[in-house]
């Protein structure tokens, strides 16, 4: 962090130094957190078009240039060369996994694909033509009531387990919402299938049986 800029009130002559924060990529950011105390003013930036609201070690985006990076990798490269769970592993742990690491990660995810039966009963309270996203949002929001052993955001292990759970269970919940709109019975996940194959099985198996 370095002080290369300052803001001056032309009416009073009072100046405030603005520290520049250099990111790994992209333009510098100015630390304006002391302006309200020193100058008695806020900044006005509708839509935060020129404001970085936080630091991120995961994502860099430049909409004007069409750039989207995850952990330094272009999103188009990840889409072309990596599977979903490889990218999920990258986002959580910071590096692309080795084969052994990916196998262990997939094993952990598959172990968490089942959803508590009482949680699935939530769908019985939704109308058959309810929007799937509304149903999924409601059920996901209720997960903390069933899996409350890993809700300490300050505990790295809790965050890791909950990340694995949400990656594993969200497709199961989404499939349940889809089946509910069709009036078809829920199809349980199969741990003998890979992650994406399981998603296809849960969505289409009942349709294929007719």
Model-derived segments and spans:
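Positively charged, low-complexity/disordered segments
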Residues: 206-210
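Hydrophobic alpha-helical bundle cores within soluble ligand-binding/oligomerization subdomains
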Residues: 2-205
């Amino acid at each position: 962090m370095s002080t290369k800029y300052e803001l001056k009130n032309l009416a009073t002559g009072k100046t405030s130094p603005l520290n520049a924060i250099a990111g790994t990529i992209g333009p510098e950011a100015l630390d304006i957190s002391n302006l309200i105390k020193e100058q008695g003013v806020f900044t006005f930036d509708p839509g935060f078009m020129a404001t970085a609201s936080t630091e991120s070690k995961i994502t860099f985006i430049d909409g004007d240039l069409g750039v989207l990076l995850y952990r330094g990798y272009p999103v188009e490269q990840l889409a072309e060369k990596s599977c979903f769970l490889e990218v999920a592993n990258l986002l959580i742990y910071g590096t692309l996994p080795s084969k052994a690491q990916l196998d262990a990660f997939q094993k952990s995810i598959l172990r968490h694909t089942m959803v508590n039966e009482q949680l699935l009963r939530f769908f019985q309270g939704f109308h058959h033509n309810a929007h799937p996203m509304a149903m999924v949002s409601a059920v996901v929001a209720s997960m903390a009531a069933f899996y409350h052993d890993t809700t300490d955001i300050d505990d790295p292990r809790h965050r890791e387990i909950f990340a694995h759970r949400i990656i594993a269970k969200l497709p199961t919940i989404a499939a349940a919402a889809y089946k509910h709109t069709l009036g078809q019975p829920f199809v349980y996940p199969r741990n003998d299938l890979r992650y994406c194959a399981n998603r296809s099985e849960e969505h289409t198996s009942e349709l294929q049986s007719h």
